[in-house]
A protein has these predicted regions:
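Helix-loop-helix "hairpin" substructures at the membrane interface of multi-pass membrane proteins
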Residues: 129, 133-211, 235-241
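Short, non-helical or kinked segments that cap or interrupt transmembrane helices
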Residues: 22-44, 58, 86-91, 161-164, ...
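Hydrophobic alpha-helical transmembrane segments of polytopic membrane proteins
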Residues: 17, 69, 222-245, 267-275, ...
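Membrane-interfacial amphipathic/re-entrant helices at transmembrane-helix boundaries
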Residues: 1-18, 46, 56-61, 87-91, ...
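Alpha-helical transmembrane segments within multi-pass membrane transporters and channels
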Residues: 22, 56-99, 106, 240-245, ...
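Membrane-embedded helix boundary and interhelical linker motif in transport proteins
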Residues: 6, 28-75, 79, 255
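Transmembrane helix-bundle core of multi-pass membrane transporters
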Residues: 84-158, 185, 251, 256, ...
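Inter-helical junctions in multi-pass inner-membrane proteins, predominant
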Residues: 1-14, 134, 155-156, 160, ...
Length: 289
């Protein structure tokens, strides 16, 4: 049981990184960026090529992949979402799905649909701590995820750009009147969320030693569930939701329900939307018409 708890926390930390990207973008512009899971996939492939082709150090490759996916996020926002800023929500939603398919099948065209083995960039060392067995890779994934979450919280709460993000999320028109560059703030939000997704992609590709162009579909959807579960638009809620989903999946597998673990996650989404639509940490607010 303790082993499953540890495994669930490690998986949940990656879901939390992904969910944070969803929740930040939604908090700023009320958009569900369904291409977010594919940014995670792009991060994994960028890390793969940097390590495999250039023999780059894993941690350097991780940082470069984060920078590259941050730029990708800004480009997607500028080309796909910014022109639709004042369009209907359904138009933006369809565009997000279109961007998702473009990234997925663009990569299928470029690299093929086959699953690739991620380079063994870090020598695995196993530690047996009583009933719990851990590897250095698992500990590293958990540590990096927690560090990135703490850094995100510091950026949002303590920096000038973080204050701008919070102002835009409350009222973008008022923020603009106060001299805040709304477009730059939204681009920065996409960059942050995409960088976290890129990091998650590299970490998971290393952990499972595999990657393929459609690897972001299921984790992307589950991370969306995590964001809704915790309270979409709320950063601590997204992190909490990620850990809860990771634990649910792990314990479902441990109790012999691995075939139903996806159904359990999506069932949680339906349940939370019926019982508490605002999420665990969210507050029910009536939308003004």
């Amino acid at each position: 049981m303790l082993q499953q708890l540890v495994n669930g926390l490690i998986l949940g930390s990656v879901y939390a990184l992904l969910a944070l990207g969803y929740t930040m973008v939604y908090g700023i512009i009320k958009l569900i960026n369904f291409a977010h899971g594919d940014t995670y996939m792009m991060g994994a492939f960028i890390g793969y090529f940097l390590i495999n082709s250039f023999q780059m150090n894993f941690f350097v490759a991780l940082i470069v992949a984060m920078l590259a996916t941050a730029i990708l996020g800004v480009v997607i926002e500028f080309l796909a979402y910014r022109p639709l800023r004042h369009s209907t929500r359904i138009a933006v939603l369809i565009t997000a799905i279109g961007v998702s398919f473009l990234l997925e099948y663009g990569m299928v065209y470029l690299v093929g649909a086959n699953t690739r083995a991620f380079p063994q960039a870090i020598q695995t060392v196993r530690y047996d701590l009583g009933p719990v067995s851990l590897t250095n890779v698992q500990l590293m994934i958990l540590a990096i995820s927690l560090i990135l979450m703490i850094l995100l919280q510091v950026i949002v709460q303590k920096t000038k750009m973080g204050k701008a993000m919070r102002a835009v999320s409350v009222d973008s028109d008022a923020a603009q009147l106060m001299g805040i560059n709304v477009n730059r703030t939204i681009s920065f939000t996409f960059a942050l969320g995409s960088a976290l997704a890129g990091a998650a992609g590299v970490l998971i590709a290393l952990y499972y030693n595999s990657l393929e162009p459609l690897m972001g579909v299921t984790p992307g959807l589950k991370s969306f569930v995590a964001a809704v579960l915790g309270g979409i638009g709320i950063i601590p809620g997204a992190a909490l939701g990620g850990f809860v989903i990771g634990l649910l999946e792990t314990f479902a597998t441990a109790f012999g329900m691995s075939d139903f673990r996806d159904a359990i996650v999506y069932g949680i989404l339906l349940l939370i939307l019926i019982v508490r639509p605002a999420g665990i940490l969210g507050k029910n607010v009536k939308e003004k018409v």
